[in-house]
């Protein structure tokens, strides 16, 4: 059996070279009318000062099919949370920042701890857990994608390929995992 055979409801990112990024994004925009897409970005404040996240935000700004973005912000004081808000305002997609070290999430975490529902340890898992909770509470997304904020080789094709298998109504996938990193943009996208 070939390595790209897909059985079941889980897909892995593949690049068969059949569609350009623009073609995939055009279809995603069409699908977005009926199938809202939301992106989760769990990040540390320190990543705002690195090289990867500014590029990721720049690439996301080139997309037009996302309905909403949830940013989970960790390890940020109040001043840094304000700076993060200013940083992410450049996105042209509506967004929500969950400031994990802020008073509102600390209060929520305390309430959930009393009921045995809060993640035990701080970190990316907890960050993602709260972001998924926000997505569920918003109840508008048909598909949710999540990726790290330290991908140095990020380009918008990665995001398109994360959503495409689960948003395309001709496919029966419920989950898509990414495992391919592209050191440079695809020649088809030039």
Predicted regions: what is each one?
Residues 1-58:
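N-proximal low-complexity "stem/linker" segments adjacent to membrane-targeting elements
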Residues 36-37, 61-71, 94-95:
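Short loop->beta transition adjacent to catalytic acidic/histidine clusters or analogous donor-positioning motifs
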Residues 73-84, 93, 102-104:
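A conserved acidic beta->alpha catalytic loop
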Residues 89-138:
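Active-site-proximal specificity loops/subdomain of glycosyltransferases
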Residues 182-189:
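Conserved small/polar residues in nucleotide/adenosyl-binding loops
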């Amino acid at each position: 059996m070939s390595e790209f055979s897909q059985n079941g409801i889980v897909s892995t990112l593949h690049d068969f070279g059949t569609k350009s990024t623009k073609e995939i994004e055009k279809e995603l925009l069409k699908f977005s009318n009926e199938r809202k897409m939301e992106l989760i970005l769990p990040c540390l404040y320190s990543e705002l000062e690195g090289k990867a996240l500014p590029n990721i935000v720049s690439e996301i700004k080139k997309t037009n099919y996302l309905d909403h973005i949830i940013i989970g912000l960790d390890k940020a004081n109040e001043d840094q949370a304000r700076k993060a808000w200013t940083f992410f305002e450049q996105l042209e997609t509506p967004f929500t920042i969950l400031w994990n070290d802020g008073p509102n999430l600390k209060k929520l975490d305390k309430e959930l701890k009393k009921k045995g529902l809060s993640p035990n340890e701080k970190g990316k898992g907890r960050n993602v857990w709260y972001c998924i909770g926000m997505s569920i509470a918003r109840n508008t997304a048909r598909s949710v994608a999540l990726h790290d904020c330290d991908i140095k080789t990020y380009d918008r094709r990665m995001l398109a390929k994360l959503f495409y298998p689960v948003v395309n109504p001709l496919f029966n996938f419920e989950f898509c995992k990414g495992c391919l990193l592209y050191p440079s943009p695809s020649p088809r996208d030039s």
